[in-house]
Amino acid sequence: MARRYEEAVAAFGEVLSLDPDYKNTNVLRGFAYYGLGDLQSARTSCETQPDYWGNQYCLALTYDRLGRHADAEAEVAKMKAAIGVTAAYQYATIYAQWGNRAQALEWLETALRVRDPGLERLKTDPLLDPLRQEPRFQAIERELKFPS
């Protein structure tokens, strides 16, 4: 999305018109709405498939911003039960957005240990912006040896 959320919402709308059942489209559109700060649209988009972990991820972020922290925690619990440590990177972004830097950094370190493919987005992911000045975050970034 490259922080081009309005364009992303429009593009995902086109994709949904072609294939309304493609599960990733609603979750990605939900993240675009989240990036725009349109939390009601993010919620609506991500509630379409409540059993899909991607939607649970989006809802964990969105519910928290809507002041529904217990519901947000329930979504994380569903993710952990369904896919466990394989979503270490996603848990890190959730905790970063919730303001829990220590837990976010722990999950990023776990992501590094398990070689979570989400780490490829570490340098540009806006969900991790709250962590960028943390020495532990910077150490992870150095260890990943991104090109300058």
Per-segment meaning from a language model:
Residues 1-148:
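Alpha-helical protein-protein interaction modules
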